[in-house]
């Protein structure tokens, strides 16, 4: 198997189309990174909301038991 490029400089130059190739790479990677960060933030927010709701329900149950006693 022969390499497509003879050197790293040739690889980064992409046969004279470096601007377009690397611009396409950047325009693909940035949205993917944003998507991952947003997904992680949403996941944490959902878990935090569930924990708050469970705590609220536990407080309500405790208050109801205290009133009944």
From Swiss-Prot:
NCBIfam families: cytochro_ccmD. It holds the Pfam family CcmD. The keyword Cell membrane applies. This is Heme exporter protein D. It is found in: Cell inner membrane. The keyword Cell membrane applies. The gene is ccmD. PANTHER family: HEME EXPORTER PROTEIN D. It comes from the Bacteria.
């Amino acid at each position: 198997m022969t390499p497509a490029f003879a050197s790293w400089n040739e690889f980064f130059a992409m046969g004279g189309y470096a601007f377009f190739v690397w611009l396409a790479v950047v325009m693909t990677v940035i949205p993917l990174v944003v998507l991952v960060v947003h997904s992680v933030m949403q996941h944490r927010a959902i878990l935090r909301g569930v924990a708050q709701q469970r705590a609220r329900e536990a407080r309500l149950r405790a208050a109801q038991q205290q009133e009944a006693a």
